[in-house]
């Protein structure tokens, strides 16, 4: 049995709002019989946090950092001398740096470039390097890819089926104290212009007055399943994404999903009857959504795609890697 230390700079803030992926990953690993103990240590930008990580690392068999960038490189350097297998999983912009396209200041652009360069350097230093989608490999310099390809693995993100359980749309709307109606969920947790809320609003406007846009922003992670259950469909209009987990979360709750072509959205929706890629033209997108929503729901993706959605199943493949090294 392996003990695993998870580290990331992505975590909910003091109000419980933010990226919950690491806590959900921790809980899913804790349920696995091949894992003796798991601890997630969030990284904060201070020396105390670095000291805590190094001190804690001695007590675990595997150290696995999620999300690359300068912070991950610094942690790897801080952990020099600790003879434990070191894993890192990159999640998107830490490799492809597509957010450069929308960066509004020179300082932010330099930060994005620095984090990308630090990620490339980290590939040399870690024992195994994971990527949440295969298309991220296209952004790695050829000399690095060729030399270190043997370290690479794909770690698809997943959904905690114990947390994401289906309830009726009406009950979910009542739980959120929303008026009964037809809602299109739009996830914009960080209130970022990259998510293109303006495009989502334009699409919904062309769908007619019977649909309302439900914006999920500043929501605690425990409320996310309720928001999805309360909706009729989920919409993604971002300019940039890596491997958006909101797609998996919606499919795990049997919700139709409509996304512009971004990240690996097309791959996630491939072969589905009730979900599809839509145009960035609001009128064309609205027409596609109308067409698909008029169909009978037949996908039942929670069951059909459980092998690629359920954290409990996905983690088995990661634990295989832990045991091989």
List each model region and its residues.
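Short hydrophobic beta-strand element within catalytic cores of glycosyltransferases
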Residues: 256-259
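A short helix/loop element that forms part of the nucleotide-sugar donor recognition site in Leloir-type
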Residues: 165-178
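A charged, aromatic-enriched C-terminal amphipathic alpha-helix characteristic of glycosyltransferases
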Residues: 20, 280, 293-324
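Conserved acidic donor-binding segment of nucleotide-sugar-dependent glycosyltransferases
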Residues: 271-283, 290-294
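A short, active-site helix/loop in glycosyltransferases that binds the activated sugar's phosphate group
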Residues: 120-150, 159, 163
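Membrane-proximal helix-turn-helix segments that form the acceptor-binding/catalytic region
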Residues: 54, 81, 109-129, 229
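Aromatic "clamp/platform" in nucleotide-sugar-dependent glycosyltransferases that forms part
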Residues: 239
